[in-house]
Swiss-Prot record:
Name of the protein in question: Cysteinylglycine-S-conjugate dipeptidase
Single Gene Ontology MF annotation: aminopeptidase activity
Organism, as annotated: Corynebacterium striatum
Similarity-based family: Belongs to the peptidase M20F family.
The entry's keywords: Aminopeptidase, Cobalt, Dipeptidase, Hydrolase, Metal-binding, Protease, Zinc
Length: 455
């Protein structure tokens, strides 16, 4: 690997061991760990034991804390020397299900190297970040250790817990997580080799709504044209949330904000989002992709139910149902915007159609100031590790509810969100992968920070 600048910039020998990284990531991936799936409880526990053992090998005081969603959060602690600050390093060892392994190029539970990338479930989200933290901590040990306090937090139910187990553990025992600087290793770079910090996460909610118009189906030949079609009514409601350019519009909510950080190039966005040739991006020429995905609320129709095409018959549909995924940026409130969406659904129902709406999964957006001394120092460490002159600062449309909970309890802490993923990683999808140089470079940056911050 080429990181001479990183290896010499702090007079430390920061040299990741790629063979060890591959071996450990292989082992952790082999312990299949989707949460909330009883048939995989044994291998989820194997992953927890593996992480616990590795943290103990690093000399940390390790404890396991059960959460209300029947997972364990693993916490490894090193006390600070004197009045040195404490740094919290977070990642999670659970994964999303691998779906149908037959559609993967290789077994998703066997780390496979192809064309310079490593493939397997969790390679980037988030077991690659677990390994990154471990490698950084080893390099710190190899260079004499750090006076900083450490709290290494590994969650077991980030993806499918559903009950915010870690959030409730933080609420009940905030002292376990007290830190001056909080590093969230659950993100990634805008591209391989481009050091990136994420400062904004959109919050959001799920809205499921049903429209009823008839007591039951009736023949379209006898009544179609005058009898109100529930599917038609549902389409009318959905269409009210989008203008002629496809932009989300919510009555009473500002959907015109501009992103103030680094831009998201249109062609790069098209490639990352896998937009088909000839298909336009939403918005006008004045709407940048970064505005649309990082700075504004957005609604995506993630489910629509009427009658499947293969079961279609000549009837007027009496009922239809849809689900919105709502994303909301800071400083707006996800709960308040979700309520506005509910009000619009009800107000826009045509013909007196009966409407039922439920709101679930509300999580608030997160934003952080990257100009604090710790994050500024870490940004320089990232630039050192990559030999880069510029640090890219972006937002993301995803949500990590943990960040909001930690910020609520520790409003004076500095936050950095970063990681080993990149747009080619295809996290949550088939053939998830990681570029091993990302694990190496981010580990170098983290190690450099832990060895030099406050000195």
């Amino acid at each position: 690997m080429s990181n001479d600048k990183a290896a010499t910039s702090t007079n430390f020998n920061l040299t990741p061991n790629r063979e060890r990284i591959f071996q450990e990531l292989s082992e952790l991936i082999s312990h299949y760990s989707p949460h909330s799936m009883p048939e995989h409880a044994d291998t989820h526990e194997e992953a927890a034991k593996w992480v616990t053992a590795k943290l103990e090998e690093l000399g940390l005081d390790v404890t396991r804390h059960p959460t209300v969603d029947d997972a364990d959060t693993i916490i490894g602690v090193k006390e600070p020397v004197g009045d040195a600050p404490t740094i919290l390093l977070y990642s999670h060892y659970d994964v999303v299900p691998a779906q149908n392994p037959a559609v993967w190029t290789n077994d998703p539970l066997e780390l496979d190297e192809r064309d310079g990338r490593w493939y397997g479930r969790g390679a980037a989200d988030c077991k690659g970040n677990v390994i990154m933290h471990l490698e950084a901590l080893r390099m710190v040990q190899e260079n004499g250790g750090t006076d900083l306090g450490l709290k290494v937090v590994m969650e077991g139910s980030e993806e499918l817990g559903g009950e915010d187990g870690l959030g409730k553990l933080i609420d009940a025992n905030p002292e376990l997580f007290t830190a001056d600087v909080i590093f969230i290793g659950d993100g990634g770079n805008v591209a391989v080799g481009i050091p990136t910090l994420t400062t904004h996460l959109r919050g959001g909610a799920q809205l499921r709504f049903k429209v009823d118009t008839l007591e039951g189906p009736v023949h379209s030949g006898g009544w179609g044209g005058a009898a109100p079609d529930a599917a038609h009514a549902l389409i009318r409601i959905i269409d009210s949330f989008f203008d002629e350019h496809g932009r989300t519009t919510i009555e009473g909510v500002d959907t015109t904000a501009k992103w103030e950080g680094d831009p998201y190039d249109r062609e790069t966005f098209r490639k990352d989002a896998r937009v088909l040739d000839g298909v336009q991006l939403l918005g006008t020429v004045d709407d940048e992709p970064a505005d649309m995905v990082w700075a504004r609320p957005a609604i995506t129709v993630i489910g629509f139910t009427s009658v499947p095409v293969e079961d279609a018959t000549n009837i007027v549909n009496p009922t239809a149902e849809a689900q919105f995924n709502l994303r909301v940026p800071a400083p707006q409130s996800a709960a308040e915007v979700a309520k506005k969406v509910e009000e619009q659904i009800r107000a826009r129902a045509p013909w007196g159609a009966k409407v039922e709406v439920s709101i679930t999964g509300v999580n608030e957006p997160f934003s952080t100031d990257p100009n604090g001394p710790a994050v500024q120092h870490f940004g320089k460490c990232l630039q050192d590790a990559y030999g880069a002159e510029h640090l890219t600062v972006v937002g993301t449309g995803g949500s990590i509810p943990l960040t909001v909970t930690l910020q609520k309890h520790f409003p004076d802490a500095e936050f950095a969100l970063y990681g080993v993923a990149d747009p080619a990683a295809n996290i949550h999808g088939v053939d998830e992968s990681v570029d091993p140089t990302e694990i190496e470079h981010v580990a170098i940056a983290e190690a450099e920070f832990l060895l030099t911050y406050g000195k």
